[in-house]
Amino acid sequence: DTINEWMAGDDLGAIHARVMGWQGDDSWLCKARDGFAHGSPLAASWIFRQLNQTQEATLEAVFESELILGCNIMRHPEFAEGVRALLVDKDRSPAWAYPDLASVPANIVDSFFTAPADMPVLGLPG
């Protein structure tokens, strides 16, 4: 029930406010809230868009979208910064490109959903 309450609607800012305002004591939900609080605002933006745009998609379309998104994520400096902060320096202090959800430009999020010219073809049966 809590997750459904958190995720209601199509406004990521409102969802973020509900999650951050939650005062429960469930350890799993606390970990999810803390991850959202400290994670990349850019990543939260493309994750939210991916979840919304593939809700009614075919499995083939979801896989294709995941491939496009994955190729673009790996090319973006935000991914390397997350790896650096968590696995390399282990300082857990990433310098995200955007400080909050409101500062993430829509055209940057859009760019994650455009296939790179050199992306491999998934070739699933249609």
Where are the predicted features?
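C-terminal alpha-helix plus adjacent terminal tail
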Residues: 1-126
